[in-house]
Amino acid sequence: NFIILNKIIDVNRTLYIPEILKFSYLPELIIIEIYDDPSTKITNKKSTIFVEFNNNNYEYILDSICLRDIKKQHVGCFITLNKDDYFFDGDSKHRIKLEPWNSETLLNKSKIITFTRESAKFNLMSGYQILYYFRNN
């Protein structure tokens, strides 16, 4: 079971992600969708978020992000594999590379990620993105 946070809290309107979320049930997965324009203004993306349920706090860990490139033509993914951070771009010749991304500093920093000068350019502070958080406890 999962929950799409935007159905409950419009992060694209409020321009922030709450510190602690409260739901009527405990999902395995929380999905946060951030649109193009708000992506430049939401500066509190977290690698860990918490849900309060039945007077207990549950931890959710950011596992992956699907991100559209800055020209709005292509999608790449930041993924976690064996506890390491990678960037995947199926359109690139090399396709996957080790790329540390899962920290508050990097999640909220304007930094171009690309494989080569000719390939698509991605930026976590500029583009449509979907964040996937899995329950850790």
Where do the protein language model's features map onto the residues?
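UBL (ubiquitin/ubiquitin-like) substrate-recognition surfaces
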Residues: 1-137
